């Protein structure tokens, strides 16, 4: 399991333990899938017509942020964590494939 620090904030609302557990589990899955991740900060808040969720994640050569809105708090949290997973996948693949392209280029130059 990764050592990523997860901070979950409920802004201007009472804590919903069901949503907290869902977010903690999803963040732990993200941290396991992307070991370069060191910190995830999740903020959940009501807005005029539903709920707002935002996430900021940092790590080694990685920084992502996203936000989402939905009528239900759990749905907003799911949406924003799906967006962050997509962003982390793009960053992760970019780092891996950049290194592979460099190695391939160096091997071709060495011939």
Residue ranges and their predicted role:
Residues 1-111:
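N-terminal, polar/charged subdomain of small-to-medium soluble alpha/beta proteins
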């Amino acid at each position: 399991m990764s050592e990523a620090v997860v901070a979950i904030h409920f802004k201007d609302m009472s804590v919903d333990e069901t949503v907290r557990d869902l977010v903690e589990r999803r963040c732990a899955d993200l941290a396991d899938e992307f070991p370069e991740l060191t910190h995830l900060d999740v903020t959940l808040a009501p807005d005029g017509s539903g709920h707002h969720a935002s996430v900021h994640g940092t790590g080694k050569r990685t920084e992502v942020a996203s936000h989402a809105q939905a009528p239900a708090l759990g749905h907003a949290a799911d949406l924003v964590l799906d967006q962050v997973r997509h962003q982390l996948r793009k960053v992760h693949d970019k780092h891996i494939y950049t290194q592979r392209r460099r190695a391939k280029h160096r091997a071709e130059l060495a011939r």
